[in-house]
């Protein structure tokens, strides 16, 4: 699939959908904020360069008591040292990216690129280097020393050494799998709470839409990153239309596949061209999943870590158990959220837009399915999956959630029955019984075990 390809029947003169500069894109860009910091440092240097007081000014002796030659030597030394430090920083960053991709999940690479500390260190080092060479260019043996520039380089040089030491400690901490799991969990939890409204019943909404309708094919291929509802609402109200979007953030679409279904208020024909143009503006399609509106991405990252941990090349079931523990916390939070489709009405109260949404079964399947299949012969991980289901069972708020939890539990027990020796199978079945106790509301019996890696009494 080629990202950004268009349908054969499209007019080549029609403008492509605009490129959106979003906060997430800027945050995930490893070069943008360091470049801004470097540019600001150069501008500040140029503004300070004309300040060249003579030796009679006492404060200049406090900032820089020596002459032009010594100042030039300082700037040369700082520039050389900072480039060495920048090389070390880039090397450590590349090692971190390689380790995250090979040992944990390729979907974690974006988290390293959007790390604020890494961008700050690169910005300080790059800014210090540019200030040094800019100041060196402005040195003149026939003129007084630009003391403010030299003082700035002196301060930035000290700051560069400090941030390099802090960065090494930060990288060492970031490469720990527990830190990666914590960051993925916290980011997913923040997106989850921004995306889904609280619902004490956890019931999904149903919306009565007329039969039929006009399918709207997509004009671009890629992955849905965000959905901007406002331009769609404006177009739908103006033209008297009702739309149901068939895709959602995280979905992969191809040219010609249906992305929406549209009805006219009066039952007449739908202006397909105008609808497609508005959809192209509203659907941000890229080449990778982003966390802005994609709650499932964080769960996918944690599931990837669990699956990778139980692979033959790593063979670390304890890490897999811990990853399922983080997933359990997210799944418990999802139980009291309004999942599924959402409806949006115009100022007159007329239903105009219905968006698609994932249900609780989707999230449970996404977490439990891959881990259960890859851990079919590892009792530690299968017990952790059942422990996750027990936590979800203890907080389930409706019968549909209980049914899904019971279905997942039975699949784990069926897997264990065909793969485990008797002693391991009995341990897993004991946890399966505790899932049933939690579903029945007997929490004392459900949580009185001593087994597992993350809970004991």
List the predicted regions and their residue ranges.
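Membrane-interface segments at loop-to-transmembrane junctions
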Residues: 19-35, 63-80, 105-123, 144-153, ...
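Short secondary-structure boundary segments
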Residues: 28-39, 109, 126-130, 134-138, ...
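Short gly/ser-rich anion-binding loops that grip negatively charged ligand groups
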Residues: 95, 99, 154, 292, ...
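Generic detector of multi-pass transmembrane helix bundles and their immediately adjacent loops
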Residues: 152-164
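A residue-level detector for conformationally permissive "hinge/kink" positions
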Residues: 33, 73-79, 83, 214, ...
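Short basic (Lys/Arg) and small-residue
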Residues: 2-20, 144, 148-150, 166-244, ...
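Transmembrane alpha-helix detector for multi-pass membrane proteins
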Residues: 37-56, 66-140, 161, 165-168, ...
């Amino acid at each position: 699939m080629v990202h950004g390809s268009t349908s054969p029947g499209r007019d080549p003169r029609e403008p492509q959908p605009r490129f959106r500069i979003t906060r997430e894109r800027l945050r995930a860009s490893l070069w943008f904020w360091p470049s801004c910091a470097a540019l600001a440092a150069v501008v500040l240097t140029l503004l300070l360069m004309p300040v060249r007081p003579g030796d009679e000014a006492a404060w200049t002796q406090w900032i820089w008591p020596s002459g032009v030659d010594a100042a030039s030597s300082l700037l040369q030394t700082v520039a050389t040292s900072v480039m060495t430090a920048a090389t070390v920083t880039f090397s450590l960053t590349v090692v971190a990216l390689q380790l995250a991709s090979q040992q944990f999940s390729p979907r974690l690479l974006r988290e390293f690129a959007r790390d604020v500390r890494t961008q700050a260190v690169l910005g300080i080092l790059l800014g210090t280097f540019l200030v040094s060479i800019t100041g060196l260019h402005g040195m003149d043996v026939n003129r007084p020393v630009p003391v403010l520039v030299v003082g700035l380089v002196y301060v930035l040089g000290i700051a560069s050494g400090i941030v390099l030491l802090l960065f090494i400690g930060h990288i060492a901490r970031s490469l720990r799998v527990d830190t990666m799991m914590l960051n993925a969990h916290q980011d997913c939890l923040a997106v989850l709470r921004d995306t889904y409204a609280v619902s004490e019943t956890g019931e999904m909404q149903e919306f009565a839409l007329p039969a039929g309708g006009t399918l709207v094919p997509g004009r671009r291929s890629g992955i849905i990153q965000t959905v901007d509802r406002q331009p769609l609402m404006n177009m739908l109200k103006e033209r008297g239309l009702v739309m149901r979007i068939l895709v959602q953030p995280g979905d992969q679409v191809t040219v010609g596949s249906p992305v929406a279904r549209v009805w006219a208020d009066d039952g007449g024909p739908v202006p397909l061209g105008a609808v497609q143009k508005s959809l192209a503006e509203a659907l941000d399609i890229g080449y990778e999943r982003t966390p802005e509106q994609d709650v499932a991405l964080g769960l996918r990252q944690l599931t990837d870590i669990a699956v990778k941990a139980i692979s033959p090349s790593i063979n670390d079931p304890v890490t897999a158990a811990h990853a399922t523990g983080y997933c359990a916390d997210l799944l418990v939070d999802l139980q009291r959220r309004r999942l599924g489709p959402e409806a949006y009405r115009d100022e007159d109260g007329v239903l105009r837009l219905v968006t698609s949404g994932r249900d609780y079964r989707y999230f449970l399947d996404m977490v439990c399915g891959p881990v259960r299949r890859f851990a079919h012969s590892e009792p530690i991980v299968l017990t952790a999956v059942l422990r996750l289901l027990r936590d979800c069972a203890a907080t389930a708020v409706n019968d549909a959630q209980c049914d899904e939890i019971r279905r997942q539990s039975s699949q784990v027990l069926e897997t264990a029955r065909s793969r485990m020796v008797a002693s391991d199978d009995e341990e897993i079945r004991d946890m399966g019984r505790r899932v049933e106790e939690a579903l029945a509301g007997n929490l004392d019996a459900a949580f009185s075990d001593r087994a597992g890696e993350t809970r004991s009494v």
